[in-house]
């Protein structure tokens, strides 16, 4: 298992959930929910600020695939966002399969007694925790980093497609 804190990113249409691991990769905890900024780069800047605050060794972006494994519009959105992150930082960015993370997060919150109205502010953070915990467990079991490394094409984070 590689050492260093990881920051998980659950990309949604309106919000982005963040979760972090401890430096030993044993546990994932929620951090915050960042508003999506489709017209600018405030979301990328905030995520990179959090990554700097926690001395992040790697960013783990959830890749929402259909149950069949096929790409969806959400898959394309997450891949594009991961590229924006990779282009704006030296921190490695990985895409990891996140099938059913939001469904699992909803179930966990429901089981904890949170109704759907109370879930909204934290659902994205809980999904990010599930994504990160899965990535950490996968790395421990396989002995290699999970998912796929996103290639970097350095650009100004304020300039994106």
Swiss-Prot record:
It is an enzyme of class 3 (hydrolase). Pfam families: RuvX. Its EC number is 3.1.-.-. GO terms for biological process: rRNA 5'-end processing. It is found in: Cytoplasm. The keyword Cytoplasm applies. GO terms for molecular function: nuclease activity. CDD domains: YqgF. Keywords: Cytoplasm, Hydrolase, Nuclease, Ribosome biogenesis. SUPFAM superfamilies: Ribonuclease H-like (SSF53098). Residues 141-161 are annotated as: Disordered. InterPro entries: RNaseH-like_sf, YqgF, YqgF/RNaseH-like_dom, YqgF/RNaseH-like_dom_sf. Its main location: cytoplasm. GO terms for cellular component: cytosol. It comes from the Bacteria. Could be a nuclease involved in processing of the 5'-end of pre-16S rRNA. HAMAP family: Nuclease_YqgF (MF_00651). Belongs to the YqgF nuclease family. This is Putative pre-16S rRNA nuclease.
């Amino acid at each position: 298992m590689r050492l260093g804190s990881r920051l998980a990113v659950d990309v949604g249409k309106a919000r982005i959930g963040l979760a972090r691991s401890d430096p030993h990769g044993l546990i994932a905890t929620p951090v915050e929910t960042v508003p999506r900024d489709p017209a600018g780069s405030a979301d990328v800047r905030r995520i990179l600020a959090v990554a700097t605050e926690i001395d992040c060794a790697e960013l783990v972006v959830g890749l929402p695939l259909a149950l069949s494994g096929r790409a969806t519009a959400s898959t394309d959105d997450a891949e594009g966002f991961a590229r924006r992150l990779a282009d704006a930082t030296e921190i490695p960015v990985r895409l990891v399969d996140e099938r059913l993370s939001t469904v699992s997060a909803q179930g966990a919150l429901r089981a904890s007694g949170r109704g759907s109205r109370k879930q909204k502010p934290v659902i994205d953070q809980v999904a990010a925790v599930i994504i990160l915990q899965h990535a950490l467990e996968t790395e421990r079991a396989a002995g290699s980093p999970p998912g796929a490394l996103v290639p970097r094409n350095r650009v100004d984070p304020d300039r994106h497609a």
